[in-house]
């Protein structure tokens, strides 16, 4: 895989300029569906930190789009390049994510990332940032709200309400599992608002998280221990 350009071209390392870059990159986000009508491959990504935050670990899982079984799993580790700054997490996570993407043997048709898409104060969470840099269709799946407000969705699986910021919709609050807090679902790049919701519902099984980010989360939390692949014993978790 190759990216469409430098990750942080022109950034001097300051918070103010990072916020300005976010606003500029947000203008390049495409919010219409460009996902293949018959996608073959999905990917899930999640990021964690090791060694007291000195090392950034990105987990990547490539899945069959029809069975949702994993075909490849990879973990990339890079030195953490900046401290945690609220609203600028993508600058911290993106280098490791790009390394993990490069480990995949095939290009995914659609990417799910554990984090925000455009449901972000400057409309550029990690899934949007990753999408603009790589050109890949992306969806952000977050466990908590970062921006905007929403009415609590109904109690049943699939119930959803729009997340609004400044009068505009930036995502969905989705009840992916009864008696669980809603997920924050938002398009990242080359996916519409309805497309982000539809693909998330399509990739849910009996868990709170959709399969791509659920498997990536498992891999990331195991510090590199791999789940079974589709060619091996079927997954039973």
From Swiss-Prot:
A Pfam family of this chain: Endonuclease_5
Organism: Xanthomonas oryzae pv. oryzae (strain PXO99A)
Compartments reported by the entry: Cytoplasm
Cofactor(s) listed in the protein's UniProt record: Mg(2+)
Substrates-to-products reaction catalysed: Endonucleolytic cleavage at apurinic or apyrimidinic sites to products with a 5'-phosphate
Chain residues that bind Mg(2+): 46, 114
Site for Interaction with target DNA, residues: 84
Protein purpose: DNA repair enzyme involved in the repair of deaminated bases. Selectively cleaves double-stranded DNA at the second phosphodiester bond 3' to a deoxyinosine leaving behind the intact lesion on the nicked DNA.
InterPro entries hit by this protein: Endonuclease-V
CDD domains: Endonuclease_V
Annotated Gene3D superfamilies: archaeoglobus fulgidus dsm 4304 superfamily
Keywords recorded for this protein, A-Z: Cytoplasm, DNA damage, DNA repair, Endonuclease, Hydrolase, Magnesium, Metal-binding, Nuclease
GO CC annotation, single: cytoplasm
Disulphide bond pairs: none
Top-rank taxon: Bacteria
GO molecular function terms attached to this record: deoxyribonuclease V activity; magnesium ion binding; RNA endonuclease activity, producing 5'-phosphomonoesters; single-stranded RNA binding
GO BP field: DNA repair
HAMAP family on file: Endonuclease_5 (MF_00801)
Lineage: Bacteria, Pseudomonadati, Pseudomonadota, Gammaproteobacteria, Lysobacterales
Designated gene of the protein: nfi
Protein name, per record: Endonuclease V
Family in the record: Belongs to the endonuclease V family.
Top EC category: hydrolase
Enzyme Commission code: 3.1.21.7
